[in-house]
């Protein structure tokens, strides 16, 4: 009996960790809501025409400043107060495949699609979370689907934000500014994007733990019963020894 209680168990460890989280199900739902909210902030800032669209990256040299957004790229000369913005519909095929033009075109194709997919997955996670309460008979199916969609949203959004970092080199090469240009990541986009991705990851981890506990509930009950049985046996033994000593 004593040997059984000392055996390490993952489900027991997970259950002990979750004892320190107040209302883990409600807590995880709040995290999902915050992740979705920051994603909406990111989308709204990207769709704002005047900012073209939430700067993700700024490449700058002595003569030119290039702002890179999710849906567009803007060029501005140092001595100019206006900037020229390039969007997908302004793609010029006569450029001969220059690195700058090619990377700009690829950027404008990849990022709107990725962002749309992330929004779809995150919205599905919200819907599936609601369905868990409306149709609890299928809670296992809802939980697995919600875990999958939130994890996919986290990974895709992290991929999208990482591409913004990597694109600094391609834009510098395309502008023939290697070694002379400086690249800075947009603070607002970084905050919205990385916080949203991080919260989706946190929700997925908490949700995975809850699903693991639910799936191994019977095993957890057996371990708990075993532990209490061991404690009860010890108490009875101490009580018996006490009365024996008292009789003497």
UniProtKB/Swiss-Prot annotation:
Induction text: Expressed during meiosis and in response to nitrogen deprivation.
Organism superkingdom: Eukaryota
Gene Ontology CC terms: endoplasmic reticulum; mating projection tip; mating projection tip membrane
Keyword tags: Membrane, Transmembrane, Transmembrane helix
Record membrane topology: Multi-pass membrane protein
GO biological process, alphabetically ordered: plasma membrane fusion involved in cytogamy
Chief location: membrane
Transmembrane segments annotated in the record for this chain: 26-46, 110-130, 144-164, 186-206
Locations listed in the record: Membrane
Family: Belongs to the SUR7 family.
Protein name: Delayed minus-nitrogen induction protein 2
Record organism: Schizosaccharomyces pombe (strain 972 / ATCC 24843)
């Amino acid at each position: 009996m004593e040997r059984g209680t000392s055996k390490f168990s993952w489900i027991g460890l997970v259950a002990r960790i979750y004892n320190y989280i107040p209302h883990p199900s409600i807590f995880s739902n709040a995290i999902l809501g915050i992740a979705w909210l920051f994603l909406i902030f990111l989308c709204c800032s990207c769709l704002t025409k005047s900012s073209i669209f939430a700067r993700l990256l700024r490449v700058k040299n002595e003569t030119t400043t290039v702002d890179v957004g999710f849906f567009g790229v803007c060029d501005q000369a140092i001595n100019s107060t206006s900037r020229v913005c390039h969007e997908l519909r302004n793609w010029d095929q006569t450029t001969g495949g220059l690195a700058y033009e090619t990377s700009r075109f690829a950027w404008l194709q990849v990022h709107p699609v990725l962002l749309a997919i992330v929004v779809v997955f995150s919205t599905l996670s919200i819907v599936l979370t609601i369905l868990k309460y409306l149709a609890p008979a299928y809670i296992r199916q809802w939980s697995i689907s919600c875990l999958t969609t939130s994890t996919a949203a986290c990974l895709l959004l992290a991929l999208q934000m990482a591409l913004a970092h990597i694109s600094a080199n391609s834009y510098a090469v395309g502008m023939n500014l290697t070694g002379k240009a400086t690249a800075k990541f947009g603070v607002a986009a970084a905050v919205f994007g990385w916080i949203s991705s991080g919260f989706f990851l946190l929700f997925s981890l908490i949700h995975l733990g809850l699903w693991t506990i639910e799936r191994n509930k019977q095993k957890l009950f057996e371990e708990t019963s075993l532990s209490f049985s061991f404690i009860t046996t010890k108490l009875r033994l101490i009580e018996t020894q006490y009365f024996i000593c008292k009789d003497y």
